[in-house]
Amino acid sequence: MLRMSGLILTLVLVTAAYEQDESEPLSPRTARFSASSPSDVARCLNGALQVGCSAFACLDNSTCNTDGMHEICRSFLHGAAKFDTQGKTFVKESLKCIANGITSKVFLTIRRCSSFQKMISEVQEECYSKLDLCSVAQSNPEAMGEVAQVPSQFPNRYYSTLLQSLLTCDEDTVEQVRAGLVSRLEPEMGVLFQLLQTKACPPSAAGGTGPVGAGGSWRWPMGPPMFKIQPNLRSRDPTHLFAKKRSTSS
């Protein structure tokens, strides 16, 4: 019933590459904007239109590694015609909600990169939840699958936030997103993930001990990802990387 192994491995590149321990000290060069950057970014956001992607273009021009939202915005606008009426409204209102949220909080967080990046992700997730992303995805699975494509700058935290929000949806919607991701991977990687997807779920997943959100839906764990993938015991190759057994008594 659970088909999590392929989905988890499809998303590992998204989350594992950018997650940072908040307690990790940041160097002055990477932790803060240059002397003129805070006012430039804030002025750009305050002068940007409340519709469209102009506000997110301001984030691409920062020196705090906040790229990603602009590309997500353009993907939504490019695919808006494929959504139904509810979906079109969601595209318009979600982009406006995120842009307004970021603009209203920019002065509180912009001087420290980690705070600024986290604020953008939180606003993004709040707007998706408020405007019922899952309901839109359920009625527009193909259109949403096209929007949730691997971005040119990969990985990035805002693309991951979009995927994590979609993972709280029903199983059919999650499968649609997963299939769309795999279809856009390089052929070799796509084959690898398809093969790994056919493996049985780890005992912990089968026993229902994996991370479960409200209403029984699966949710991507926010801590460091851990994977326990085992091949079929009868066909185990003792020399294979994945065939190494965990020592229990020796």
Curated annotation (Swiss-Prot):
This is Stanniocalcin. Corpuscles of Stannius. One of its GO terms (biological process) is intracellular calcium ion homeostasis. The lineage of its organism: Eukaryota, Metazoa, Chordata, Craniata, Vertebrata. Keywords: Disulfide bond, Glycoprotein, Hormone, Signal. GO terms for molecular function: hormone activity. Glycans are attached at residue 61. GO terms for cellular component: extracellular space. Its primary function is the prevention of hypercalcemia. Upon release into the circulation, it lowers calcium transport by the gills, thereby reducing its rate of influx from the environment into the extracellular compartment. STC also stimulates phosphate reabsorption by renal proximal tubules. The consequence of this action is increased levels of plasma phosphate, which combines with excess calcium and promotes its disposal into bone and scales. Residues 228-250 are annotated as: Disordered. InterPro entries: Stanniocalcin. Residues 1-17 form the signal peptide. It comes from Anguilla australis.
